[in-house]
Amino acid sequence: MSEAGNVASGLGLPGEVSQWSLKRYGRFMLLDNVGSPGPSSEAAAAGSPTWKVFESSEESGSLVLTIVVSGHFFISQGQTLLEGFSLIGSKNWLKIVRRMDCLLFGTTIKNKSRMFRVQFSGESKEEALERCCGCVQTLAQYVTVQEPDSTTQELQQSQGPREAGESQGKDPLQQGPSLTLEQHVCMAAGAGVLQERTSVTHRAQSILAPEKLTLAYEGSSWGTEELGPFLRLCLMDQNFPAFVEEVEKELKKITGLRN
């Protein structure tokens, strides 16, 4: 179940939102063993897969998964944005697999692939599963969520606490919840460049043009109260800078034709 409706004031998000607390967020990394000569060159070519895990804590901040009514998806820790993209039309490039209280995401955009996964938090295992199910229901409005081990989950739930505990003793975020999906994402276009954490301010600075508009174009029909939240929403979408770049290219084409 979602924990909040309009409580995304910390990130300045407009509109109704649904949020879920996370225990962990993991980002799949493929470390290149460049400069490793000798017999291990074949292993170096394959790379060393590992997971960079972020924990929810008082020091680093709480991990939160947010889905805005507009279809925007975010994962944040405090004021830091870890993931951000639009779920609209995501069936073509986004794959999601559920395993117990964890979700594994695989994306392939412009021949670049990456993966990340989340584990939901809760006072009990049942509460974490409930939050995961609530998030899956919201995600299902935009993209299919695969549950290949649903039969296994039912068997584990039918077991006693001791048997279930033994089968779930390992940290699910450190396991490979769906090796086939990981292989599919990695083989689709090789290991993509993984984004590091970034702030909304830094992203705004990276696409803000230094030129100042002439006086004739300085007016705007949008008020500051409306424009601010809208821009923050756009900047938190990791594909927005590429969109701005495409718009700039088209504008240059138009001005070139007119000149």
Curated annotation (Swiss-Prot):
UniProt record similarity statement: Belongs to the REC114 family.
The keyword Oxidoreductase belongs to this UniProt entry's keyword annotation: no
Comp. bias intervals (Polar residues): 150-160
Tissue-specific expression: Expressed in adult testis and embryonic ovary. Also expressed at low levels in liver.
Disordered: annotated segments: 150-175
Region (Interaction with MEI4): 203-254
Outcome recorded upon mutating residue 104 to A: Strongly reduced interaction with ANKRD31
Name recorded for this polypeptide: Meiotic recombination protein REC114
Recorded name of the encoding gene: Rec114
Subunit structure: Part of the MCD recombinosome complex, at least composed of IHO1, REC114 and MEI4. Forms a complex with MEI4; the interaction is required for MEI4 stability. Interacts (via C-terminal domain) with MEI4 (via N-terminal domain). Interacts with IHO1. Interacts with ANKRD31; the interaction is direct.
Effect of residue 27 to A: Strongly reduced interaction with ANKRD31
Organism for this UniProt entry: Mus musculus (Mouse)
Known function: Required for DNA double-strand breaks (DSBs) formation in unsynapsed regions during meiotic recombination. Probably acts by forming a complex with IHO1 and MEI4, which activates DSBs formation in unsynapsed regions, an essential step to ensure completion of synapsis. Required for spermatogenesis and oogenesis.
Alphabetical list of Pfam families matching this protein: REC114-like
Gene Ontology CC annotations of this record: chromosome
Protein keywords: Chromosome, Differentiation, DNA recombination, Meiosis, Oogenesis, Spermatogenesis
Location in the cell: Chromosome
UniProt keyword Zinc, yes or no: no
Outcome (variant: residue 28 to A): Strongly reduced interaction with ANKRD31
Gene Ontology biological-process annotations: DNA recombination; meiotic DNA double-strand break formation; oogenesis; spermatogenesis
